[in-house]
A protein has these predicted regions:
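Surface-exposed amphipathic alpha-helices with a cationic face
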Residues: 126-129, 165-170, 264, 268
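Short histidine/acidic/glycine/proline-rich micro-motifs that form metal-
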Residues: 83-85, 182-185, 250
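Active-site glycine- and acidic-residue-rich loops that bind
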Residues: 116-119, 183-194
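Conserved strand-turn element in the central/C-terminal portion of the radical SAM core barrel
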Residues: 143-145, 152-154, 167-189, 210-215
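Auxiliary Fe-S-binding modules of radical SAM enzymes
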Residues: 1-6, 12-13, 191-295
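A structural motif
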Residues: 106-107, 173, 205
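Conserved Radical SAM active-site core
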Residues: 1-137, 141-149, 158-162
Length: 295
């Protein structure tokens, strides 16, 4: 049985307009995917026992009340701090039921995951898209399933994510790939970037949004560097990161200029969007700016 943690609120107003979101929603706390680079592990977020997934108490009741009180609807984003399709979601169904509430109250949604389980809820995505903007994103950082298993050990491998996204895109949902982080010295090759963009095109994804580097904050930095030493003992990646990145918050690939050039050329070739403004305009097209909530 999943552990629970108390919660007073779940849907919060966002600032900055990340992917055009008006609200943010995290039903679960923590994540068990084991991704070695996860920024949510950082000390600044204050999540204790990060690798243990816990559900927020009375999550659906809180979400129902908060949606009902909103004067205007908008896009509710989820997946920023904890993957909404962790293994517990298969039986708990909290994300699915939350999406049903989002649909019932006339809101749009932006869902991010690394789990192929996301395809299960395609029917609800389609219902939401009938009245509001609906966006589905999946994080993919490498085309190599073997490398994926090393750096993202407890979640669907890249090929499974591509398959899931293809099914969702086939149903008419606006989909895309979050190409981030791209780990310097490990994933920052032209072959990897080209492979992801071309696969995005093949599966019907509309955009790829990249970040050619990785964030290294307190707590997460130490975890990441330790894992590099464990997984790739012969590569000396830890030493290379320490020498190249120093104590910087963001470690950008030394190949960033070349990668951006290759990336934009490939996106242009296949009509893949990559600019945030263009992506938001495209997936919200035809819905209007805001909608009144009559519930």
């Amino acid at each position: 049985m999943i552990e629970t943690v108390p919660a007073k609120t779940i849907i919060t107003k966002t600032k900055g307009g990340w992917f055009g979101n008006d609200y943010n929603m995290n039903i679960y706390r923590g994540c068990c995917h084991g991704c070695i680079y996860c920024d949510s592990r950082s000390e600044c977020y204050g999540i204790d026992r990060f690798d243990t997934v816990r559900a927020k108490e009375n999550a659906l009741g809180i979400i129902r009340d908060e949606l009902r009180r909103k004067v205007r609807s908008g896009v509710v984003g989820t997946g920023s701090m904890s993957d909404p399709y962790n293994p517990f979601e298969k039986t708990e169904l909290l994300t699915r039921h939350a999406l049903e509430l989002i649909n019932a109250y006339g809101f749009g949604a932006d869902v991010l995951s690394k789990s192929a389980l996301i395809a299960r809820d395609t029917d609800i995505f389609r219902e939401i898209a009938e009245h509001s903007p609906m966006l589905v994103k999946m994080t993919v950082t490498t085309c190599d399933d073997e490398l994926c298993r090393l750096i993202e050990p407890n979640v669907s491998v890249s090929s499974e994510r591509f398959d899931a996204l293809a099914k969702i895109a086939e149903s008419g949902i606006f989909t895309g790939i979050m190409l981030m982080p791209v780990l310097p010295f490990i994933e920052d090759t032209e072959e990897n970037i080209i492979g992801i963009v071309r696969t995005a095109h093949e599966i019907g994804a509309r955009f790829v949004y990249p970040a050619f580097g990785v964030t290294l904050r307190a707590n997460q930095r130490e975890y990441f560097l330790d894992k590099l030493g464990e997984i790739f003992p012969e590569k000396n990646y830890r030493r290379r990161y320490e020498e190249f990145c120093g104590g910087r918050y963001e470690c950008v690939s030394p190949n960033v200029k070349r990668l951006w050039k290759v990336f934009t050329e490939e996106c242009g070739k296949y009509g893949i969007l990559y600019d945030m403004g263009d992506i938001v305009s495209a997936y919200k097209s035809g819905y209007g700016d805001t909608q009144l909530s009559f519930f």
